[in-house]
Amino acid sequence: MKIIVIGATGRVGANVVAKLAQNSNDEIYAGARKPEKIPAADNVTPFKLDLNDKMDDIKEGLPEADAIIFTAGSGGRDLLKVDLHGAVKVMQAAEEKEINRFVMLSSKGSLSPDEFADSSLENYLIAKYYADQWLIHNTDLDYTILQPTALVEKTGSGKVTLGAYSTNENSIDNVADVLIGLVENHAGIKEVIEMSTGNEPIPEAINELN
């Protein structure tokens, strides 16, 4: 499978690329503003992608692929231009290039606007809300939106809860495994999926989505 990872030098994106690189059957295109930071691997092709560019330029830079995993974010620095508008431009480019599978890394509560004011991440959630809404209502992509709880840098347990929240955190390791599993198993299409650390092995949890 040919998979594009957007945000390939971020915490989650880098983890996704590293895991995919271990599967010789996958051809990975790792997109980032600074592709030189992406570790070399036989089946990983880094490419430059700046979400501040025009949509046509983003489209021209996108390789031919079967799926996109979108993990990019501005870290709160440029929410409208990157987390919202940048994401929408990638969706538009994907449609024009007929890359129909699109897995979006979002956040818990991104589609619950009545709760935004109570969150310390209010502005981030607003940006994610409109990006997610665009993906659902303004594209024909085979999307999946993953809504994990807080991301933590610890070794993944390999066990999760999908479709509900059982804890307040997720290891980045587990999130990367779920994103990959959603793509490789064609699971959760046209679904918004809640995620937290849990008790079910990731392959089993993903299989139950089909």
Give a label for each model feature.
Residues I3-N23:
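N-terminal Rossmann NAD(P)H-binding glycine-rich loop of SDR-like oxidoreductase domains
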Residues V12, I68, L146, V175-L179, ...:
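Non-catalytic, hydrophobic alpha-helical segments
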Residues Y29, K34-P35, G76, V82-Q133, ...:
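Conserved Rossmann-fold NAD(P)-dependent oxidoreductase catalytic core, especially the SDR/UDP-sugar
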Residues R33-K89, A93-E96, V183-A187:
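NAD(P)H-binding glycine-rich loop region in Rossmannoid oxidoreductase-like domains
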Residues G86, T167-G181, E191:
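Substrate-positioning beta->alpha
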Residues A117-D118, E122, I126, A150-D173:
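SDR active-site lid
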Residues K154-V160, L182-E191:
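Glycine/proline-rich active-site loop of Rossmann-fold NAD(P)-dependent oxidoreductases
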Residues V192-E200:
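Short-chain dehydrogenase/reductase
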